[in-house]
Amino acid sequence: MSQNFGKISQVIGAVIDVEFEPGKLPPIYQALRVTNPAIDDQEFNLVLEVAQHLGENAVRTIAMDSTDGLVRGQQVKDMGKQISVPVGKKTLGRILNVIGEPVDEMGPIGNEKEYGIHREAPAFVNQSTKVEAFTTGIKVVDLLAPYARGGKIGLFGGAGVGKTVLIMELINNIAKQHGGFSVFAGVGERTREGNDLWMEMKESGVLDKAALVYGQMNEPPGARARVALSALSIAEYFRDEEGQDVLLFVDNIFRFTQAGSEVSALLGRIPSAVGYQPTLATEMGELQERITSTNKGSITSVQAIYVPADDLTDPAPATAFAHLDATTVLSRQIAELGIYPAVDPLDSTSRILDPQVIGDEHYAIARQVQYVLQKYKDLQDIIAILGMDELSEEDKLVVARARKIQKFLSQPFHVAEAFTGSPGKYVELKDTIKGFSEIIAGKHDDLPEQAFYMVGTIEEAIEKAQKLAV
């Protein structure tokens, strides 16, 4: 097949119009390439993706890199396929960009296979209908807001409350306990944070179990709107071809929507509520529906969600909520108490916190833990004004147990060993349930609350109490 060439007719920011000969229009989502001397000296170094057919043998495309330096009349090459990214084990330990090129200066990927970034969601007949919990080894998550295998989890939290450390611990635990791989999509991230994550993953030894795909804040909107899809294709390969349970991290899903809204106006679409793109729900659906369990494997995704101006009704976070199975809310108040992971046990939710999925014992203990913590929260005003002495004996007991539970929800992480000096702990679900049921039953009312801080199992707490008593 002979090469198909067109030429640039118009450049509008990140959007480029290209004219082709009659009958040779490339289809929607096809990749085109053009030479941009402002990027580097390579020929055909800028990738464009066809977004619209304008009539008059012209297509409107979105650029995946800078368009500075392009001129009208320049030659554009039709690649004959959509944007494709390398897939397979060779991508592990590497950083790729939106078009699958390595950006870590460690040479070519050397992959055998590529996947297109736009793929169909798995057919109904291939989807797994089994609902089961996905054990993370993190007590507060497994007990109170368990993740579903193949589910979608929203991770909410401001700056500096430990989102990245939690993400790294999950990558570490899935690699060591499940032997699984992780894919990290940095969507509209700060470049510094992306670099920090890479360095920290290298130091904590989890880098060779993860593939990283970055489209940072300084990238044009085309790259930021597509980088999540590139990462998803890499994850789909591990699920479908290798039968893996994959973890997909997206940080930040809001930036995916934001990039879509930047491009949307340039494409000539009339904006909808709050200036977002009219195709907001469709774009989100196309991404989220591909994240699921099939009869071969699963993709479980953890998505950090930025909430603009703390307004949960904003169309961007509101659209993301519709797809979530669980939410993990990180709280600054809890971080200030020195309790890490700073997960809010009363604010975090899960669709599978249900006796039919997790069993009656787990459900009962989780609800009792939440009841005790809520009671303590209600009593805090009285304690602040009148002091502990004014409480009834029953309330004093509730407060004592709640404080022990609060401390016991903390846990040393493997990836933070260098900072905390204490070895990380992976806690099995049965040990988590046993520990909390014993605290609630009052078996450890005689132990000091400090014994429960930063330990794994209840046995470790008892051991720590004996050391403190010496």
UniProtKB/Swiss-Prot annotation:
Transmembrane segments: none annotated. The keyword Transit peptide does not apply. The keyword Cell inner membrane applies. One of its GO terms (molecular function) is proton-transporting ATP synthase activity, rotational mechanism. InterPro entries: AAA+_ATPase, ATP-synt_VA_C, ATP_synth_F1_bsu, ATPase_a/bsu_AS, ATPase_alpha/beta_chains, ATPase_F1/V1/A1_a/bsu_N, ATPase_F1/V1/A1_a/bsu_N_sf, ATPase_F1/V1/A1_a/bsu_nucl-bd. GO terms for cellular component: plasma membrane; proton-transporting ATP synthase complex. ATP binds at G157, G158, A159, G160, V161, G162, K163, T164. It is a peripheral membrane protein. SMART domains: AAA. It is found in: Cell inner membrane. Pfam families: ATP-synt_ab, ATP-synt_ab_N, ATP-synt_VA_C. It catalyses: ATP + H2O + 4 H(+)(in) = ADP + phosphate + 5 H(+)(out). PROSITE patterns: ATPASE_ALPHA_BETA. Keywords: ATP synthesis, ATP-binding, Cell inner membrane, Cell membrane, CF(1), Hydrogen ion transport, Ion transport, Membrane, Nucleotide-binding, Translocase, Transport. It is an enzyme of class 7 (translocase). Belongs to the ATPase alpha/beta chains family. HAMAP family: ATP_synth_beta_bact (MF_01347). PANTHER family: ATP SYNTHASE, ATP SYNTHASE SUBUNIT BETA, MITOCHONDRIAL. Produces ATP from ADP in the presence of a proton gradient across the membrane. The catalytic sites are hosted primarily by the beta subunits. F-type ATPases have 2 components, CF(1) - the catalytic core - and CF(0) - the membrane proton channel. CF(1) has five subunits: alpha(3), beta(3), gamma(1), delta(1), epsilon(1). CF(0) has three main subunits: a(1), b(2) and c(9-12). The alpha and beta chains form an alternating ring which encloses part of the gamma chain. CF(1) is attached to CF(0) by a central stalk formed by the gamma and epsilon chains, while a peripheral stalk is formed by the delta and b chains. This is ATP synthase subunit beta. It comes from Geobacter sp. (strain M21). The gene is atpD.
